[in-house]
Structure formats: structure tokens, C-alpha cells
């Protein structure tokens, strides 16, 4: 691996070591103590950088309850995105989605569907997200996948694809079931994916109420009414086995945080603890994007190609979360996986690592990727590059 770590070498190699912002007097990074959280498990994650700011028992497998509906919403959102279903499609409600006829649904949150009802996908989707309707989950699952079992297969397939390694779904709605579990960390990752992958689906999560069949029901996420935070989602979950769960997301300026609280003892506690986490995160941290998605971080020599240089960057991974007030002390260097870059190169190909440092300490690493395709050059050009590369290896940068 070829590493560019000093300022002088970096300038010779094409700005390999960069002051991302104007340097200031050294300010020692202060350790920010996380708040105590009254719950079985919890986590606070930055959306853009993926940085975990605080956590407690974040990998303990617990019952997600209606947080399961975040995945239900994700699957529906993906089906809409792929045009497999449309919001205007009319769904015929089956007997399995009838709370009166399905013992598993009695006493749970429902949309009050009846067998034979014709309900649009749009209304059922709002019934899942806003009203937490277990009957709506069943009706949508039957329509999207043909059965609840097939839909659960889709849920677990997406869980695997998203890297939710400690999550298994057994129901489409989240009512207690043997073998159904998730973790605070996995739920934060799922929430992040919902926002990023299906933003139109996520937008429904901020709606405060929904009326169906003349029955108005409020969104169960009371943080949507918070005067202290700009919360725009996501989902509550409550069962006897799970306790009181909440995934919440809020924004402040360009920064978005995701909090997860699992197994709180009361409804009030889950909201208070979530608000505490989000407020703490915004108070002590900030997220910056020193390398924009389409921006070039460094230009590097490439051999045997149809061009002599290639632009390298971070793609969508250029955001970092740092303690507030430390922005001007942020620097970055890069390391190439191989000593030389040789064509062909494909856009998005990983060729090294970007290392972000704060006050001389490495804090985050990101893939260094190719920003444009580089095809192989012609025969004579490749022969010439071979000769020049050998001279470069023998005599240094005079022949580059």
C-alpha cells in the first residue's frame, strides 16, 4: 500500500495530505460524556456519516414490536419505486386482515378494515405508517407478495441485503412471535435505509394523523409535536414482551440524527429518553461534508489508459461527524491500495482509503473511489507508458 501522510510528500504527489479547512490554534478534543438512558438498549447515529455518537446494549437482540413496520414500509416503498404496485391500486381486503375474525389482531392497533373492503394502496400505506394498523400490514402484504409468508421472506431478504445481521422477522406487523428479534443498531441502520432509499415513503412518517372510514387516528409518535426538535419520523412499537420502543429521526440545519430506544418501561420514558438523546447529539456534534459527492479529492497518475490522470473522490461517503467547534482542525490524507494505478478503471472502483484526522488523530476512514471511467489506451501508448513507468520506478517523479 502506498500512503501519503506528510504535507511535503502530499504536495509532490498531488495534494495527498490536505488541510480541509484553514488551520487554527490547536484545540484539544474534549470527550463528551453520553447521557444516561433509561431503556434496555439504545443508540444515536448520524444519518449522513453513519457515525454512532452514543450507544448502550446496541447489539442485544430484543423484540422490535411495531418497529417491524419500518421494514414493512421499506418493502412497500421498494415495490412502489420499482412500479410493481401503484398508490392508486385498489386492494380487496381478505378475512386474514379482519380484526374481528383474526384472534391475533384483537386488542391491537388496527385500521378497522373489513373483508371485501376495496382500499387503495395509498390509504393502506398510511394505515401502516400513521395508524400502526396491523390489519393494514396484512392487507398490503397479501397484495404485494401474495401472502404474509412470502412478504416476510422479502422482509428478511432486505434485512440481509442491508446488513441487519441481528434481525429476523416472523410477522408483517410486529406482534409478539417466537424467533422475531432485532437490535437498536439494526433498527438505526434500517431507519437510515428507509430515509435514503425510499424518501417518498419516509415522507409519510411525518404526517400527524390519518382519517379512514370516518375514523381519525393520530400518529403515535408524539415527538412529531415536539417544540424543541424538528422530528419528522419514524415509528413507535409496544407489546407486552417488548416494552416501549421508539425509532425517531430529527433534523437541525443540514444535520440529521436517528435515535433508537428499546425496552423502555413506560410510554413517557421512551419519548423523554429519545428527546434527550437527539438534543444531546445536536448540542455537542456537527456533521460536515468536506468532500462533496461529485467533487475531486485528489488527481492521480494512471498508467496504460486513454488518459494520463484520473480524478479520485469519496462519492457519497464524504461526510464526517465531529465535536462542535472542531471543524477547522479537520484534515485528510489518502492511501492507495497499489503503488500505481493502471487502466482499465471503472467509475466507483475502490483504489484506496481516505483517512480523516482531527487534531492529529485518525477519526474516520472512507473508500477512495474512481470518479470516471478510464479505458485502456492504444498499443503504442501502453508501450510508452511501460517505459515511462519503469523510469518512474527507478528515478522517481522526474519521469512522471
Swiss-Prot record:
UniProt GO cellular component terms: outer membrane-bounded periplasmic space; plasma membrane
Q: Which residues form a coiled coil?
A: none
- Hey, what's the signal peptide range on this chain? 1-27
According to UniProt, this protein's pathway is: Cell wall biogenesis; peptidoglycan biosynthesis
Q: What's its top-level EC category?
A: hydrolase
In the record's own words, the domains note is: The C-terminus forms an amphiphilic helix that targets the protein to the periplasmic side of the inner cell membrane.
Q: What is the name listed in the Swiss-Prot or TrEMBL entry for this protein?
A: D-alanyl-D-alanine carboxypeptidase DacC
Q: To which species is this protein native?
A: Escherichia coli (strain K12)
Question: What gene does the UniProt entry assign to this protein?
Answer: dacC
Amino acid at each position: 500500500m502506498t500512503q501519503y501522510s506528510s504535507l511535503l510528500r502530499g504536495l509532490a504527489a498531488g495534494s495527498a495530505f490536505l488541510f480541509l479547512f484553514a488551520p487554527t490554534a490547536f484545540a484539544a478534543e474534549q470527550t463528551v460524556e453520553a447521557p444516561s438512558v433509561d431503556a434496555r438498549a439504545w443508540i444515536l447515529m448520524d444519518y449522513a456519516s453513519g457515525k454512532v455518537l452514543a450507544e448502550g446494549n446496541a447489539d442485544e437482540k430484543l423484540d422490535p414490536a411495531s418497529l417491524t413496520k419500518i421494514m414493512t414500509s421499506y418493502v412497500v416503498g421498494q415495490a412502489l419505486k420499482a412500479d410493481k404496485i401503484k398508490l392508486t391500486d385498489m386492494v380487496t381486503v381478505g378475512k386474514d386482515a379482519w380484526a374481528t375474525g383474526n384472534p391475533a389482531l384483537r386488542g391491537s392497533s388496527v385500521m378497522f378494515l373489513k373483508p371485501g373492503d376495496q382500499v387503495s394502496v395509498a390509504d393502506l400505506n398510511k394505515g401502516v405508517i400513521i395508524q400502526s394498523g396491523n390489519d393494514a400490514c396484512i392487507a398490503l402484504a397479501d397484495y404485494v407478495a401474495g401472502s404474509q409468508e412470502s412478504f416476510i421472506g422479502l422482509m428478511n431478504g432486505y434485512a440481509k441485503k442491508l446488513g441487519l445481521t441481528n434481525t429476523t422477522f416472523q410477522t408483517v406487523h410486529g406482534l409478539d412471535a417466537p424467533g422475531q428479534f432485532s437490535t437498536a443498531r439494526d433498527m438505526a441502520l434500517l431507519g437510515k435505509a428507509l430515509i435514503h432509499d425510499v424518501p417518498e415513503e419516509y415522507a409519510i412518517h411525518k404526517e400527524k394523523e390519518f382519517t379512514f372510514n370516518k375514523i381519525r387516528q393520530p400518529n403515535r409518535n408524539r415527538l412529531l409535536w415536539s417544540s424543541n426538535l424538528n422530528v419528522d419520523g419514524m415509528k413507535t412499537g409496544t407489546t407486552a414482551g417488548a416494552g416501549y420502543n421508539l425509532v425517531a429521526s430529527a433534523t437541525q440545519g443540514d444535520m440529521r440524527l436517528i435515535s433508537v430506544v428499546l425496552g423502555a418501561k413506560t410510554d413517557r420514558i421512551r419519548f423523554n429518553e429519545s428527546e434527550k438523546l437527539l438534543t444531546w447529539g445536536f448540542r455537542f456534534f456537527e456533521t460536515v461534508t468536506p468532500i462533496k459527492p461529485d467533487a475531486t479529492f485528489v488527481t492521480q497518475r494512471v498508467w496504460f489508459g486513454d488518459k494520463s490522470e484520473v480524478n479520485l473522490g469519496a462519492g457519497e461517503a464524504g461526510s464526517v461527524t465531529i465535536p462542535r467547534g472542531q471543524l477547522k482542525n479537520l484534515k485528510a490524507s489518502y492511501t492507495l491500495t497499489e503503488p500505481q494505478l493502471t487502466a482499465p478503471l471503472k467509475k466507483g472502483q475502490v483504489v484506496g482509503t481516505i483517512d480523516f484526522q482531527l487534531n492529529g488523530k485518525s477519526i474516520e476512514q472512507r473508500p477512495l473511489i474512481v470518479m470516471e471511467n478510464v479505458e485502456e489506451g492504444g498499443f503504442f501508448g501502453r508501450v510508452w507508458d511501460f517505459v515511462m513507468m519503469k523510469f518512474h520506478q527507478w528515478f522517481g517523479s522526474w519521469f512522471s
